[in-house]
């Protein structure tokens, strides 16, 4: 059977394929335009960031730039300057995707030379197409975005403004970007640096920074989280719970209601470590130290011993228990056997080093006195007259001493008759056991 409509089917198929190819070509163009637009938008954001950094730089250095510019001669700001001063991050590239380099030209306003105005201009590299310039001029968010089409004039987005590059001492070429920073914009930037913002401004930490001293007029700073400072001077009291200091704390006096903890030494150059209420010094690790609980004695905490390789010296030294020495007992003063002493029980030595003890009020040697065996001993008898007597005044001596091993504990005198020499002295001698 013959097919009379076969040609129509082929024609329909070809038409459908043609439409698909046209749609693909159209879609590819739309996609390409979309990609380009996104790229230009990205470039516009980069220009906006650069311009914002330049605006901040001008605001902070307003007075300096006034001195280095005129109405016709600009002060030029480069990417390197913005990076070195921290207004741009160190990773910001010197050129954009087309190799163009941004610079800001700052001049004085011709009508009011005390005010500054600026133009951000790109130069060098590959020119942008007009379509890209128009798109980017509209997308720039800092300042008034524009572009350069004739190499001499900067034109604003939607042709909203037009300024000759020569007014700013700038040079560029066709297909480049321009951004106008008006006197109002830069005056606002200068004022930004003079204000202390109550809230954080993203990307603008300088707005929360003081650049001079602040006088609170005797008013308070309340609800402060932390105070970080190099030094502090207080004419009144400083009250707090805890304090940590990495350096020195100096003052005329200090009062603490609770504790003071130091990681190193506590020194007094010309004063005392004064405590009250039966307190003193305590070593927490070992539980020892010194304190006073009355007006007479310095006491050892927990009855700890006192150890030194040097001397312990005092008017008197008393031991309620035994007195020990790891070497010898050295007695520096000497006593004389038989001499009086007090109280009984003292221990001494004579000049030869022999030990003496105080017994019954007399220094005696190591042997005890046998008082039950004491006897009177008298001097020898000499029948002679005293001085002025019958024998013509001769003088005679009658010595008396105790036998060896005895000690004299008393004396008595004996005499008879006028002029008769029967006077003598008796000695009361007691033997040692």
UniProtKB/Swiss-Prot annotation:
Among SUPFAM superfamilies, the record links this protein to:
Enolase N-terminal domain-like
Is Nuclease given among the entry's keywords? no
Keywords recorded for this protein, A-Z: Plasmid
Q: Which Pfam families match?
A: Shufflon_N
Q: Give a yes or no for keyword Chaperone in this entry.
A: no
Q: Where is this region: Variable region?
A: 362-433
* Transmembrane portions of the chain: none
Chain segments carrying region Constant region: 1-361
Extra remark? This protein is expressed by a shufflon (= clustered inversion region that works as a biological switch). The orfs of this region share a constant N-terminus, while the C-terminus is variable.
Q: What is this protein called?
A: Shufflon protein C'
Q: Which organism is it from?
A: Escherichia coli
